[in-house]
């Protein structure tokens, strides 16, 4: 296919136009008084959002060269979102400022490579200052404030995230689901829960809740399918003599083995239940081992020379309580040694560090949570499905932001941290005037988030930036109330990681765009129908009526 190629200024101008179209749509959402954006859906009602990355993802431009610019800024938003889970709008505003300021300098005849080196030098210095500005976020109040800000000043979201983190700890897994009521709800699962239910409804002993409840049971863990009852009999007899309930977790239990367990349970000879082991393949083996460590038991596996016929009570784990419903099994208060559990958690953490797959990391993190903390589910309440989806996206953002805050601490919010870091950096000198121009344009770009927040709040941006610049420490502008003051005291915080990721992602992509000299795209195809033969002569077929 033939290609269309643009060079120099023409290429950069078309690219900048695409950047500005996308950034202008995204930046209206910034700050406490940011507006909504309505997104058309191919079917069903449109969705309404204040989430920058959701807006960016929807934008595709007709002009291929403009679209390239837009897609590169979309990459900035996605990169910030992937690394910190928030800060996408800030990253987009910064990228737009870097590109526009940079292209002005390039058009004026400056060397793009030196400009980029100046930008990189200034960004590195500002990142170091942000680290110095950050304060630890380790109490419920600051976690609540970060969650509130990230959820667009929705206090209820900040509160529920802080409660969830308090309940399950910072290692715990917090998930967000759509709820059934108008209010947000928090559901905390203590102990280890996995998504496997009872193998037969005949194990149910609490008819009201349709659950199996086992108090102080033995737990038999088997890494294979059980279909022959003779293998199970010795273990069953030992447990029956001890007079305790039994939970069997195996790859599968079927045929006469399952039938015998059901009959013994119904006759009251031994209170028992059976569930499939969670996960598949190697992950199932690892999760069985997790359960063994949590309950103080041993996985009966032929790989390590253990057979089911020779299993003794010492090989079985125990727990204070086990609840099993149709879909989930929850083990509460396993009898495993704390030192063993801590060792296992440390081992899984090392696996997380060495893993390159996001999916594997997420699954490993879930295993850590099940061993060390717990699982909390935030159920989102709303009056309509459209509101529910918008709210869920905001809560997801807020959750990522609070995790980022716990990780790297918090800095003053509302665009103040960048302005303050800028003031603290002092004078940086490049190797030549063009690098100095790159440093200067970075300093101008860093004010843009504060300007945009002020603009969205209907205030005079230049006056506010000057006032904040003249202040010290955490002094800044509260766009929600229109007042100046200490941002930390007013509860306006941003996670340092979010601000840092936004700045680095924006500078990285903008540096590439400034140094672009040519753009190549497919040539638009001519109208395919233009060369087709004229069908006008078919009109004479009207006379065919006489053939009837």
Swiss-Prot record:
The gene is groEL. It holds the Pfam family Cpn60_TCP1. One of its GO terms (cellular component) is cytoplasm. It is found in: Cytoplasm. ATP binds at residues 29-32, 50, 86-90, 414, 478-480, 494. It is an enzyme of class 5 (isomerase). PANTHER family: 60 KDA HEAT SHOCK PROTEIN, MITOCHONDRIAL. One of its GO terms (biological process) is protein refolding. It catalyses: ATP + H2O + a folded polypeptide = ADP + phosphate + an unfolded polypeptide. Together with its co-chaperonin GroES, plays an essential role in assisting protein folding. The GroEL-GroES system forms a nano-cage that allows encapsulation of the non-native substrate proteins and provides a physical environment optimized to promote and accelerate protein folding. Belongs to the chaperonin (HSP60) family. Forms a cylinder of 14 subunits composed of two heptameric rings stacked back-to-back. Interacts with the co-chaperonin GroES. Its EC number is 5.6.1.7. Keywords: ATP-binding, Chaperone, Cytoplasm, Isomerase, Nucleotide-binding. It comes from the Bacteria. GO terms for molecular function: ATP binding; ATP-dependent protein folding chaperone; isomerase activity; unfolded protein binding. This is Chaperonin GroEL. CDD domains: GroEL (cd03344).
